[in-house]
């Protein structure tokens, strides 16, 4: 079984590309059913956020990568975007190292941001719910979560965390002098939407309107605030008219706010959705300011220097954690092989022993039977090693011969 991952992220792909290849907003159960239906795909975990879409897989044949790319390409709306031009393939320990760094926030656009760990955990939970995760992949994710917890407790990588949501609010503040007199509309009440809401409330705007598909979730977030209200997405036309700042963090398949939905009133639009929820053409209107996820980079750069030292400490913890994981996996593999070896030996011995005992009970010469039993066991036990040594010799694999000699305590110098 091999461990691989296929990824499209912000480092190689701009927002319009990431939007095309995003798997968020699709039926999760359908995604898992379809990917597990591919021959040689054994287990899978699908992660899709605003900055990346990654698929972690246990496979039985590396040639299946082409089939997985075809599967992924099938969800792309614009055929001009070819996944082979953008994806990154990782294998083996590289997958585990990347996932550890990702969960610790070291691969994020905002170095050290904590939200990604929750997103990785959510993806893991959905995979389990859809019976898509196996023992090996489960052990990988459990070690990843333990590593992230240790990094958070032993470093200050998350100290005064600066998230994409926080950076978005920073951009809004730069564009509006007196935010206390402004009305803010947040579209989406998911994890990022809730984080946006918290940051916005700290700025004490005149009014915060939170719109979501299910109003109960929005009501739960806004209920403790006098200047906040919860709304259905269907109320967007009325809410847009009131809003000075519109921030979107929602999973949609098409734009939910376009130029025809807004008038001449100056507004700040910030879209951190993938795929994009606010039409980028809104920024072409003279009175508007428009930001997408990629525009947040400049704000994030200001924060990176502060976290580089803590990042190096986190890297050391991750390397140590990976070493621990690999050692444990070696033990699991060897213990499994040893158990299988003993079971094989038991099977060989039990059958011959029963036959020999039956002959002795029938009055046959016990000494002769025991000698014959020992000879048969010797032949059976050594059969596969002898075949293996002959095959290794034919192929010129002296390394295999040396290894097998060591296994049986033979002289490796001869």
From Swiss-Prot:
Catalytic residues as annotated in Swiss-Prot or TrEMBL: 50
GO-annotated biological processes: protoporphyrinogen IX biosynthetic process from glutamate
Keyword Magnesium: no
InterPro entries listed in its UniProt record: 4pyrrol_synth_GluRdtase (IPR000343), 4pyrrol_synth_GluRdtase_dimer (IPR015896), 4pyrrol_synth_GluRdtase_N (IPR015895), GluRdtase_CS (IPR018214), GluRdtase_dimer_dom_sf (IPR036453), GluRdtase_N_sf (IPR036343), NAD(P)-bd_dom_sf (IPR036291), Shikm_DH/Glu-tRNA_Rdtase (IPR006151)
Enzyme Commission number(s): 1.2.1.70
Site (Important for activity) residue list: 98
Reaction catalysed by this enzyme: (S)-4-amino-5-oxopentanoate + tRNA(Glu) + NADP(+) = L-glutamyl-tRNA(Glu) + NADPH + H(+)
Binding site for NADP(+): 188-193
Pfam families: GlutR_dimer, GlutR_N, Shikimate_DH
Keywords: NADP, Oxidoreductase, Porphyrin biosynthesis
GO MF entry, a single one: glutamyl-tRNA reductase activity
Residues noted as binding substrate in the record, renumbered to the chain: 49-52, 108, 113-115, 119
Pathway connected to this protein: Porphyrin-containing compound metabolism; protoporphyrin-IX biosynthesis; 5-aminolevulinate from L-glutamyl-tRNA(Glu): step 1/2
Primary role: Catalyzes the NADPH-dependent reduction of glutamyl-tRNA(Glu) to glutamate 1-semialdehyde (GSA).
Other facts noted in the record for this chain: During catalysis, the active site Cys acts as a nucleophile attacking the alpha-carbonyl group of tRNA-bound glutamate with the formation of a thioester intermediate between enzyme and glutamate, and the concomitant release of tRNA(Glu). The thioester intermediate is finally reduced by direct hydride transfer from NADPH, to form the product GSA.
Subunit structure: Homodimer.
Family of the protein in this entry: Belongs to the glutamyl-tRNA reductase family.
Comment block on domains: Possesses an unusual extended V-shaped dimeric structure with each monomer consisting of three distinct domains arranged along a curved 'spinal' alpha-helix. The N-terminal catalytic domain specifically recognizes the glutamate moiety of the substrate. The second domain is the NADPH-binding domain, and the third C-terminal domain is responsible for dimerization.
Designated name of the protein: Glutamyl-tRNA reductase
Organism: Francisella tularensis subsp. novicida (strain U112)
């Amino acid at each position: 079984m091999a461990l691989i991952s296929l990824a499209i992220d912000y480092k190689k792909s701009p927002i319009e590309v990431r939007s095309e290849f995003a798997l968020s907003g699709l039926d999760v159960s359908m995604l898992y059913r379809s990917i597990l239906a591919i021959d040689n795909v054994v287990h899978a975990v699908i992660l899709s956020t605003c900055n990346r879409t990654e698929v972690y897989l246990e496979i039985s044949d590396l040639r299946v990568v082409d089939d997985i790319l075809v599967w992924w390409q099938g969800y792309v709306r614009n055929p001009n975007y070819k996944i082979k031009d953008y994806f990154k393939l990782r294998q083996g320990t590289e997958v585990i190292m990347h996932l550890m760094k990702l969960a610790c926030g070291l691969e994020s656009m905002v170095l050290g941001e904590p939200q990604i760990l929750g997103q990785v955990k959510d993806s893991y939970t959905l995979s389990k719910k859809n019976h898509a995760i196996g023992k090996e992949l489960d052990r990988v994710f459990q070690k990843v979560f333990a590593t992230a917890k240790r990094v958070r407790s032993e470093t200050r990588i998350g100290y005064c965390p600066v998230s994409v949501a926080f950076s978005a609010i920073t951009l809004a503040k730069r564009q509006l002098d007196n935010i206390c007199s402004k009305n803010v509309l947040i579209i989406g009440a998911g994890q990022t939407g809730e984080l946006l809401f918290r940051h916005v409330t700290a700025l004490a705007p005149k009014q915060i309107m939170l719109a979501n598909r299910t109003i109960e979730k929005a009501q739960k977030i806004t209920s403790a605030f006098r200047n906040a209200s919860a709304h259905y997405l269907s109320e967007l036309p009325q809410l847009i008219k009131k809003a000075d700042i519109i921030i979107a963090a929602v999973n949609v398949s098409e734009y939910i706010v376009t130029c025809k939905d807004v008038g001449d009133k100056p507004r700040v639009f910030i879209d951190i959705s993938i795929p994009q929820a606010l039409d980028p053409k809104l920024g072409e209107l003279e009175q508007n300011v428009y930001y997408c996820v990629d525009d947040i980079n400049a704000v994030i750069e200001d924060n990176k220097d502060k976290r580089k030292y803590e990042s190096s400490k986190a890297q050391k913890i991750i390397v140590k954690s990976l070493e621990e994981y690999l050692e444990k996996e070696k033990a699991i593999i060897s213990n499994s092989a040893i158990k299988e070896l003993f079971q094989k030996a038991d099977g060989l011995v039990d059958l011959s022993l029963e036959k020999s005992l039956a002959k002795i009970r029938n009055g046959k010469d016990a000494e002769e039977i025991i000698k014959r039993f020992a000879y048969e066991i010797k032949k059976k036990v050594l059969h596969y090693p002898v075949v293996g040594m002959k095959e290794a010799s034919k192929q010129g694999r002296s390394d295999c011969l040396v290894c097998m000699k060591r296994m049986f305590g033979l002289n490796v110098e001869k």
